[in-house]
Amino acid sequence: MRNSDNYGEITRKAKVKHGIWTGVKYFFLALWAIIVLFPFYWMVLTSLKDYGAYNSEYIPKFFTLYPTLANYAEAFTAVPLARYFMNTLLFTVVTTALMLIVITLAAFAFARLEFRGKRIAFTLLLSLMMIPNELVIITNFVTITDWGLRNTFTGLILPSVTSVFYIYLLKENFAQVPDELYYASKVDGASDMAYLTRVLIPICSPTLVTVIILKVIECWNSYVWPRLITDDSRYFLVSGGIQAIREGGFGRDNIPAMMAAVVAISVPLIALFLIFRKKIMEGVSRGGLKG
């Protein structure tokens, strides 16, 4: 009987301890979620406030009783934001497609093919990750300028069609596929390209989807390179367009409309991430596993 009482007491204390720890954990998680989400909430809230109401707030309010969508209409009419969207869409689609071809072929060569200097070449490729991005931008800018490709989509796209990190990620994923599949395809008379397209790519599709999504996000958020290589508004992306809005005085005078433009630009990426977040995590974990 005594042992039973002791066991019950131990169980009760364990449950209390577990409950306290769970409560503390969820408290800090909730606090962290608020810290992370508050800037986006404030951005959306500001975009829904009337211009006059916003300027009359000496003390900022955390809600609005009279939300309005007029700021969104003004954001698209005050500047050619729709054109910036189309430019960004074109830049993102073409860059992602070309990069996917380049990194897939490069990753396949390093993962499966045998050629002289393969290890040295791969080591040199990885060493490029150690070079500061600022130095690469300077080199790319001089090269694109010498080729006469400033203020062109070609100049925007060319420096972004490859990525050492994505080649490494995809190469590690390709290397996990059993060698027996490669030898079996060779016995069946398949070429290396047939093995790549019919076997490797379907098996490694989660990683490829991850790379595509991450590249789309990267292209959509590009600012430094597009801003550096283009000064013609016909080639502005949404990021450069927002800066043009602000420099033109519109953003300084009408913060709610400025926030409406930022929300409109952010929503596609947020939706993309929320829809494919499981694919992203699955692809990254697959690329980082050995065996």
What does each model-found stretch correspond to?
Residues 2-17, 21-291:
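A structural signal for multi-pass alpha-helical bundles of membrane permease subunits
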